[in-house]
Amino acid sequence: MIKRALISVFYKDGILDFAKFLTSKNVEIVSTGGTYKYLKENNIPVIEVSEVTGAKEMLDGRVKTLDPKIHGAILAIRDNPTHMETIKERGITPIDMVIVNLYPFFEKVQDDNLKFEEKIEFIDIGGPTMLRSAAKSFKDVVVISDVKDYDLVKSEMEKGEVSFETKKYLASKVFNLTSAYDAAVSEFMFNSLESKEDKKLNYLNMSYALQEELRYGENPHQGASYYVSTTDKGSMKDFEQLNGKELSFNNIRDMDIALKIVLEFDESKKEYACSAIKHSTPCGAALGSSVLEAYNRTYECDPTSIFGGIVAFNSTVDEATAKELIKIFLEIVIAKDFTPEALEVLKTKKNLRVIKYKTNTNDKINLVKVDGGLLVQDEDTTLIEDYKVVTEKKPTEEEMKNLIFGIKVVKYAKSNAIVVIKDFMAKGIGSGQTNRIWACEDALERAGDGVVMASDAFFPFRDVVDACAKYNIKAIIQPGGSMRDQESIDACNEHGIAMIFTGIRHFKH
């Protein structure tokens, strides 16, 4: 039976009604600081925690509940006579319910206006300690860490008592919360180091919060959820949906890739970029002198595959572009913004998901789940550090610009990957092949014609160069590093093709 509850909450939503309910059930309430004042002002009978501990708050509120009279009251095992005799001797009254939510560290750590020292003050100490004590004692103590659980506990109390299963569930939510909270603090502290060189943390603790339950995963028989980082900003975290159906698992994955491609280009330099994605694979990408031209050129890359795909822009979509977009079936259009006229046009397609991104891509690490483990690597952000022309013929300035465009696109295609480029259009994309010549032939056949070619990895044989010669490719960019590099260089010289080595591979599995 619940006789005494301790309430200490930062978020006051719903607590007044719940406290009134507890009072109606003759539950004595103990509270701290701001919560005590809030309940008192609203005529809720409440005891200040200092009356229980016999000690006033100290160190600017850093120490309030870190006291044996609080934790002894929570941790005492009710069916252990020794425990109960001990707390009785010390004048400690058991606490049967703990209601705590934490300082808003998740929110404050992302606030660029706060200094490091100011963020430190939002690290909660007493709150997690009380929650963990109560969760450990879940058989005897009901612990609530989520405002959404007030109604659950209330309904069970009205029927008699909170069930063992519910108490265990609430305890599991506590450890889920405190582990995420500590992970966020650890990540914040580690990322604030002046140098991380030769420094590694022994555990990978990443803090993600449930954003929404998805209808299903990659396929209808797979359950799925979407979680977002509690510490990092990111384009897939704070976007705004302006129209259309709810997003699916596949939508979010494809949208992420589509946006990353266009954000390789700088709108401020009038690099108006557009990309099209289907099944996590680029089927078109282009630059244009306007948003409309960028889209039309992307569509021209592969008018068949773009159907039912995701289209992304690094700039604002205008009315003229919107009128072209609605001519075909698309799942998503994501852009920096939309003019009011463009949005009105796009909304004529009620199921078309229209997404406005607010943050540029911010990924620093890449995670791959394997059975029983997690592979962690740096995100592939390096393009060209120091390229080298290895052939007799050198690329023209325009060819070089197209080659760099190609590298920015090919890194997002599944390996083995080849992209054939003409006038800043990815006219042919060969990807996901188990050998490079197949990827090359696929890209060349799709392109029909092209000027330059980009490869995500080196050529093991000269066959790729020979195939390029048949399609009149003028220049090639690739990492180099094969034992047979010289054979490919010789082939380029024979065919009058320029070739550049970047020294940077872009495998994508």
Swiss-Prot record:
The superkingdom of the source organism is Bacteria
Give the UniProt keywords, A-Z: Hydrolase, Multifunctional enzyme, Purine biosynthesis, Transferase
Which Pfam family is an annotated match for this chain, by its short name?
MGS
GO terms, molecular function: IMP cyclohydrolase activity; phosphoribosylaminoimidazolecarboxamide formyltransferase activity
MGS-like domain ranges (all copies): 1-145
Pathway in which the depicted protein is active: Purine metabolism; IMP biosynthesis via de novo pathway; 5-formamido-1-(5-phospho-D-ribosyl)imidazole-4-carboxamide from 5-amino-1-(5-phospho-D-ribosyl)imidazole-4-carboxamide (10-formyl THF route): step 1/1; Purine metabolism; IMP biosynthesis via de novo pathway; IMP from 5-formamido-1-(5-phospho-D-ribosyl)imidazole-4-carboxamide: step 1/1
Show the catalytic activity. (6R)-10-formyltetrahydrofolate + 5-amino-1-(5-phospho-beta-D-ribosyl)imidazole-4-carboxamide = 5-formamido-1-(5-phospho-D-ribosyl)imidazole-4-carboxamide + (6S)-5,6,7,8-tetrahydrofolate; IMP + H2O = 5-formamido-1-(5-phospho-D-ribosyl)imidazole-4-carboxamide
Database matches in InterPro entries: AICAR_Tfase_dup_dom_sf, Cytidine_deaminase-like, MGS-like_dom, MGS-like_dom_sf, PurH-like
* PROSITE patterns per UniProt: MGS
Q: Name one GO biological process term.
A: 'de novo' IMP biosynthetic process
EC code(s) of this entry: 2.1.2.3, 3.5.4.10
List the GO terms this entry assigns under cellular component, sorted alphabetically.
cytosol
In the record's own words, the domains note is:
The IMP cyclohydrolase activity resides in the N-terminal region.
- Tell me its family: Belongs to the PurH family.
* Alphabetical list of PANTHER family matching this protein: BIFUNCTIONAL PURINE BIOSYNTHESIS PROTEIN ATIC, BIFUNCTIONAL PURINE BIOSYNTHESIS PROTEIN PURH
User: Which HAMAP family would you find in this protein's record?
Assistant: PurH (MF_00139)
Q: Which NCBIfam families match?
A: PRK00881.1 (NF002049), purH (TIGR00355)
The protein's name in its UniProt record: Bifunctional purine biosynthesis protein PurH
Q: Which gene encodes it?
A: purH
